C-alpha cells in the first residue's frame, strides 16, 4: 500500500489534542484535590498510622463541613463500631437512613451496617429485625448467617434450622452445625419429666439426613458419634436396653476417639445383664488400640473391682510404661485411695496375740495409706490444669466435654482428649 504524505499533517495535531486532554484532566484532579478539606487527609494519615481515635476526630470535622457525604459516614460508623462505641455507630447509620435522598444501594448498606451495630451491642431483637430487612438484597448471605448466630445464641433451634435451609438455598455448601441443631432438638424433646420420644426420634432422623453430607470427614465422625449417643439415650427412655447397648457399641467403630465418652454407660449396659466381664474385655481391647486417659481410668477401676489389686496394677504398669502420664498416675492413685478408705483393717479380736498382730498390720496399712495420700496430693497439684478439655479455636478450657464451645460458640472444636494428651 502507498504511503500518503498528507497523513503527516495529522500526527502533530493528534499529539496536541492528547496533550491538551491530559492537561485538562490533571487540572481537574488538582482542583478536586484542593477542594477536599485538610481534615480529610489528616484522617487518612491517622488511619494509615493505626490511630483510629484521631482519625475519627478528623473525619467528624469533614462530616460537619459536608454532611451529605455518605461514604464518610460509613467510614465513621465502621470506626465507631470497631472501637466499641456502639451508640455513636448506631446514630451515624440511623442518620444515613433518615435521609430521603439516599440512593437505594447506600440505603441497603446503611441498613446492613446498622444491623451489625445492634448485633455487636447485644440488642438481638433489633438486630434480627434489621437483618430481616436486607434478606432480599445483596447482603442476603451475611444477613442469614447473622440470623443463624442470633437464633443459636437464643437456643431457638427450629428457627436456626429454617435459617440454615434458607442459607442452603443461597449457597451450595454443607452447614455442619445443622446436625447439632437437630441433636439439640432431640435433647430438648427428651428433657423433663414427660419426654416426647416421637419428637426426639424425628429430630434424630433429620440429624442423620444432615450428617449424610458430612460422611467421610472428621466432622462427620463426631456428628455420627453424637447421634448414636442420643439414640442410645432415647432407647433407654423407651426401655429398649439391647438397642441402647448396640448404639453405644457403635461409637467404638464409627468414632473410636469418642469412645471414652460412652465407656461408663456401655459398661453399665453389660452389668445390667450380668456380662460385666465381657464388657470389661471390650473396653480393654479398645484401649489397647485407641489409648486415652479417660478410657484408662474406666478400665483400671473396673479391673480393680472385678479381679482385684494385682491384675489392675499389672494393667496400669503396662499402660503407663507404654504411655507415660502424670494424669494417668493421678487417676490410679485416686482409685487406690478410694479402695483403701473403703476397707477397715481394725476389728475386735478376743485373743490378745491376734489383737497385737492386727494392730501392727493396721499401723502398716495406715502408714501406706498416708504415703498414698501424700503422693497423690503432690501429683494432683501438677495435674489439675491438665485434667481438662480445650477448644482448639479459642483455647477455652473446661472440665466437661462440650459439643459447642462455651467460649467462642464453635461446634466440634473440643477434642475428646485431655490437655495432657494433646501436648
Walk through the language-model features, giving the residues of each.
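Structural motif corresponding to the intra-repeat A-B loop/turn of tetratricopeptide repeats
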Residues: 49, 83, 121, 154, ...
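Generic helix N-cap/helix-start motif at coil->alpha-helix transitions
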Residues: 3-4, 33-39, 66-73, 103-111, ...
Amino acid at each position: 500500500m502507498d504511503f500518503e504524505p498528507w497523513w503527516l499533517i495529522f500526527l502533530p495535531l493528534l499529539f496536541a489534542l492528547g496533550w491538551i486532554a491530559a492537561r485538562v484532566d490533571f487540572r481537574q484532579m488538582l482542583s478536586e484535590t484542593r477542594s477536599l478539606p485538610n481534615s480529610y487527609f489528616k484522617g487518612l494519615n491517622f488511619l494509615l498510622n493505626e490511630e483510629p481515635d484521631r482519625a475519627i476526630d478528623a473525619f467528624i470535622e469533614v462530616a460537619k463541613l459536608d454532611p451529605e457525604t455518605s461514604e464518610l459516614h460509613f467510614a465513621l460508623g465502621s470506626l465507631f463500631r470497631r472501637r466499641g462505641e456502639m451508640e455513636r455507630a448506631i446514630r451515624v447509620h440511623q442518620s444515613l437512613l433518615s435521609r430521603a435522598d439516599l440512593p437505594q444501594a447506600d440505603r441497603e448498606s446503611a441498613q446492613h451496617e446498622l444491623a451489625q451495630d445492634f448485633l455487636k451491642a447485644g440488642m438481638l431483637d433489633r438486630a434480627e429485625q434489621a437483618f430481616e430487612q436486607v434478606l432480599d438484597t445483596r447482603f442476603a448471605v451475611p444477613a442469614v448467617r447473622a440470623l443463624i448466630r442470633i437464633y443459636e445464641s437464643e437456643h431457638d433451634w427450629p428457627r436456626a434450622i429454617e435459617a440454615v435451609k434458607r442459607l442452603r438455598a443461597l449457597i451450595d455448601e454443607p452447614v455442619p452445625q445443622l446436625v447439632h441443631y437437630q441433636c439439640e432438638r432431640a435433647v430438648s424433646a427428651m428433657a423433663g419429666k414427660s419426654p416426647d420420644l416421637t419428637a426426639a426420634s424425628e429430630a434424630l432422623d433429620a440429624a442423620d439426613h444432615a450428617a449424610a453430607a458430612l460422611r467421610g470427614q472428621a466432622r462427620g465422625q463426631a456428628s455420627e458419634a453424637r447421634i448414636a449417643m442420643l439414640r442410645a439415650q432415647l432407647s433407654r427412655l423407651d426401655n429398649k436396653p439391647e438397642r441402647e447397648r448396640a448404639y453405644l457399641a457403635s461409637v467404638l467403630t464409627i468414632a473410636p476417639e469418642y469412645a471414652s465418652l460412652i465407656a461408663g454407660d456401655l459398661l453399665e449396659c453389660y452389668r445390667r445383664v450380668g456380662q460385666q466381664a465381657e464388657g470389661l474385655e471390650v473396653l480393654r481391647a479398645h484401649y489397647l488400640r485407641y489409648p486415652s486417659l479417660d478410657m484408662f481410668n474406666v478400665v483400671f477401676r473396673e479391673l480393680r473391682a472385678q479381679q482385684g489389686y494385682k491384675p489392675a496394677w499389672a494393667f496400669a504398669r503396662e499402660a503407663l510404661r507404654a504411655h507415660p502420664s502424670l494424669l494417668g498416675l493421678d487417676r490410679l492413685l485416686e482409685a487406690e485411695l478410694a479402695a483403701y478408705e473403703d476397707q477397715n483393717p481394725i476389728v475386735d479380736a478376743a485373743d490378745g496375740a491376734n489383737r497385737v498382730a492386727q494392730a501392727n498390720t493396721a499401723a502398716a496399712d495406715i502408714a501406706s495409706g498416708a504415703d498414698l495420700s501424700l503422693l497423690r496430693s503432690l501429683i494432683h497439684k501438677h495435674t489439675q490444669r491438665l485434667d481438662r478439655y480445650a477448644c482448639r479455636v479459642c483455647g477455652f478450657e473446661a472440665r466437661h466435654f462440650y459439643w459447642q464451645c462455651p467460649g467462642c460458640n464453635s461446634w466440634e472444636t473440643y477434642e475428646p482428649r485431655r490437655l495432657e494428651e494433646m501436648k
